[in-house]
Regions:
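Structural preference for beta-rich elements and adjacent junctions enriched in aromatics
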Residues: 19-230
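Sec-dependent signal peptide recognition
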Residues: 2-10
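Hydrophobic h-region of N-terminal signal peptides that target proteins for export
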Residues: 10-19
Length: 230
């Protein structure tokens, strides 16, 4: 009886440790396929109605693990040729910092999508667009402890500012990245930086002492589709 009780306690403890170690195990979006391309113009086309989406974002800074001060919606779709990402960022128009900036400058209000395309939980691509439509990209290395800013992909991104906030659209061709064709899911995270109050907002939750970690990304699940373009 004691041995059985001990086994149960060990199993419960292990489950609690796993849950504590990665709060993002249940975070997942389905990558649904559409047949027509989306025009990258910062306007919300009807095709986005078919996309899986999330509003479940968390504040990392300045107030760790507190509710975000603004609402963010992220959506994702695919065609045979490319992944499409839409981010709807609600805000007071007068508080949006739309700095023109330079490529790879990461300036002003900016949103990002990060993709672990090999499922190794150590490397990922990062694609970012600021509120004025300037794009930036990089490779995340060593579980996001290091960055390779020299990497430049061939992809599209733009933004549009509205009275209620701004919209970012991205198109990432599969031929512009490397990936494991055998995988049915990739690692995924979204990020939003709000310059006005220096607020860093993530889809996934991280430990304050560590910061963002690829090993704790959520999932992007390929729904009846796997990319084959190289």
């Amino acid at each position: 009886m004691k041995q059985r009780l001990l086994i149960i306690l060990v199993l419960i403890s292990s489950s609690l440790l796993l849950a504590t170690g990665n709060k993002n195990l249940e975070k997942a979006l389905r990558l649904l396929k559409i047949n027509s391309e989306i025009i990258i113009d910062g306007k919300i086309d009807s095709a986005w109605n078919y996309a899986d989406s999330t509003t479940n974002f968390f504040q990392f800074e300045p107030y760790f693990n507190q509710p975000t001060s603004v609402k963010t919606i992220a959506k994702i779709l695919t065609t045979e040729e490319a992944i499409y990402c839409l981010m709807i960022c609600y805000d007071d128009k007068n508080l949006i910092q739309a700095n023109a900036g330079m490529h790879d400058g990461y300036t002003g209000d900016i949103v990002s999508i990060m993709l672990d395309t090999f499922g190794d939980k150590q490397t990922a691509y990062k694609f970012a667009v600021n509120a004025s439509g300037v794009i930036s990209d990089s490779r995340m290395l060593d579980d996001a402890r290091n960055r390779d800013y020299s990497w430049d992909g061939i992809w599209q991104g733009t933004s549009q500012i509205y009275d209620w906030g701004f919209v970012v659209e991205m198109k990432i061709p599969y031929k512009s990245i490397k990936y494991d064709k055998n995988l049915s899911e990739w690692g995924l995270d979204f990020d939003r930086w709000r310059s006005y109050n220096k607020e860093d907002i993530y889809w996934c939750e991280y430990e304050q002492s560590e910061g963002q970690r690829i090993s704790k990304f959520g999932k992007l699940i390929f729904q009846d589709f796997k990319p084959t373009v190289t």
